Amino acid sequence: MTPEPTEPQIKVYRYRWVIIAVFAVINIVVQLQWLSFAPIAKAAQSVYGVSALQIDFFSIIYLAVFVIFCIPASYVIDTFGIRIGIGIGAVLAGIFGLMKGLFAADYIMVCIAQTGLALSQPFIINSTTKVAVRWFPITERATAGGIGLLSQFLGMIVAMIVTPYLISVDARGVYSISQMLMTYGIITAVGAVILLVFLRERPPTPPCIEGQDERFKVFEGLRHMLKNRDMILLIMVFFLGLGMFNAITTCIDQICKIRGLNFEQTGLVGGMMLISGVLGSIVFPLISDRLRKRKAVFLFTGICSIPGLIGLAMAGHYWGMLISSFAMGFFFLGGAPILFQFGAEINAPAPESTSQGLLMLAGQIGGILFVIGMNGLGMIPSMVVFIFFSLINAILFFLMRESKMIQPDLTSTMDGQAQ
């Protein structure tokens, strides 16, 4: 007699929270390095004797290197796994973070170190959805993605708020940034070691039913994604939305300088956007997972972010900038992890790291173009253009279709038994 087939027992493991925690640590330090000059651009200009655009170049390097290495990094992650993929990023971050601190006084050497740090970024960022799929059930994946994105915000928050307090100025008005860069270098190296010690490739048993984690190869997945109508719309959304965010955070010192804000106030304006983004990235993914809806939630956050952007463009005083920054960050950044998870779901069985990498690629290209445009057109006129772009994004959100994977009938069998 042939035994009757039985349903496989699905288990999720508590160690998944260790995985997402160490992944968060490496995200924090890499994003900290990205924006280390953003709130102190004027001081950095004085130290290196260069133009504002040359200081913005430290951020542009991150965006440009991501554009070049996005797909190769996704290939490594999908071919060799998250331990090797993220591990490569961690090693690069640790080495070049220390180099940036050791050669802090030399503009060229700092540019080289920043390039190495930028190379680490796609190996780490492109792994977010892969980590979520490898370790978490479908009903926790937007939450896991939200934690990954939250950690990126935390790194940016530290860069924005703490950096102005780590630079020094002597009686002659000469700035020093060496202590700040060395401190960040040591923190980055420690974060890399923590990641390498605790990261594991996969749990003993998968967190989903058989077949739910089957994936195309990278280039087959790319072809699949580029034939997907909703993915094309999502790429356009990230080109405009993430591009605007990258440009605003890069040029935050120039934006605030027009309003007469000092370094500390500039850092708080930028930090407020990111702090509220952390709150939003906790609240909205939980709502999305609980309601089992993606489109309705990110459409809501996209529309609600527009008044905050209008305030950043029009506010004439410090408190207006703070309030507007909070409003924009809470809704604009709060919807981001849902969009990443939505992209992974509508493109299944394409690799998650490839879908996330393609979306990030669009946003980085947009960021490069928008930073250059802001330095040419001017800060306030560019912010007005961004308001128009946000309205376009709201229309694109409306045109998208809901993810089928998140529907209740498909997720009811996928909840695991915690072990």
Regions found by a protein language model. Give the residues of each.
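Juxtamembrane intracellular "pre-TM" segments in multi-pass secondary transporters
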Residues: 5-13, 202-234, 415-419
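Extracytoplasmic gate region of multi-pass secondary transporters
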Residues: 37-38, 228-281
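Conserved MFS/SLC helix-loop-helix module at the cytosolic interface between two early adjacent transmembrane helices
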Residues: 68-107
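Helix-to-loop junctions at the C-terminal end of transmembrane segments
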Residues: 69-81, 280-293
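Cytoplasmic membrane-interface "Motif A"-like loop-to-helix N-cap segments
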Residues: 79-90, 289-302
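Cytoplasmic helix-loop-helix junction between adjacent transmembrane helices
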Residues: 113-151
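C-terminal transmembrane helical hairpin of 12-TM major facilitator-type secondary transporters
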Residues: 292-339
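A late C-terminal transmembrane helix in Major Facilitator Superfamily
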Residues: 344-378
